[in-house]
Amino acid sequence: MPRCNNRAPAQMRPVRIIRHYVRHAEGSVLIEYGETRVICTASVIEKVPPFLKGAGQGWLTAEYGMLPRSTGERMQREAAKGKQSGRTMEIQRLIGRALRSILDLEKLGERTIQMDCDVIQADGGTRTASITGAFVALYDAIDYLRAERMISQNPIRDHVAAVSVGILKGQPLLDLDYLEDSGCDTDLNVVMTGSLGLVEVQGTAEKVVFSRQELDVMLNMAQQGLQELFDVQRKALETVA
């Protein structure tokens, strides 16, 4: 079936990362996966959660949210509802796990990196774009800590990025947009490190079960897309601050 912009099944949407997008944050980016746009910030907080006091290590946590008009129809703010949705909590925990997987928390010292990922326009893949962009924001926050001599060693061990893949009408597709995601038979989110280690695989058969062979096809397709995303991250980090 034809895709938007005539993309091939294994073709990513155009991806762009703009660093230093928010003036006050130690690290920040605007990331675009096609028409999906997310602002990711990294804030340095000079304390750790109570369960880590005196442990000699730091922490990283994440929050995720969507602007009310990031979607086709206005959503009510979760603050107005008085609680976060299960989806929001699931996504922000995923972002935190993904970034902690490549971070040496002992080298961070007793401080917290607070990640905030705010979707300003949604067209599928908001959680995967958040992870990919948040890594670059984290990298810049760590650069800040090193420049200020607050840490002596780089705690980042590897890159991390994420991409979606799915099966729509029997066809495996990489980097699903909203229409593809809402209509697909199978939906998979894959988080991987730059050394190609799997951090997380979230997979669901929405309408039709998928085989082990189809799973392997999707994972291979995701890995191909993730290698492109690592290149985008590296090129963004090579730009002059």
From Swiss-Prot:
InterPro entries: ExoRNase_PH_dom1 (IPR001247), ExoRNase_PH_dom2 (IPR015847), ExoRNase_PH_dom2_sf (IPR036345), PNPase/RNase_PH_dom_sf (IPR027408), Ribosomal_Su5_D2-typ_SF (IPR020568), RNase_PH (IPR050080), RNase_PH_bac-type (IPR002381), RNase_PH_CS (IPR018336). Its EC number is 2.7.7.56. Keywords: Nucleotidyltransferase, RNA-binding, rRNA processing, Transferase, tRNA processing, tRNA-binding. Gene3D superfamilies: GHMP Kinase, N-terminal domain. Phosphate binds at R87, G125, T126, R127. Phosphorolytic 3'-5' exoribonuclease that plays an important role in tRNA 3'-end maturation. Removes nucleotide residues following the 3'-CCA terminus of tRNAs; can also add nucleotides to the ends of RNA molecules by using nucleoside diphosphates as substrates, but this may not be physiologically important. Probably plays a role in initiation of 16S rRNA degradation (leading to ribosome degradation) during starvation. HAMAP family: RNase_PH. This is Ribonuclease PH. The gene is rph.
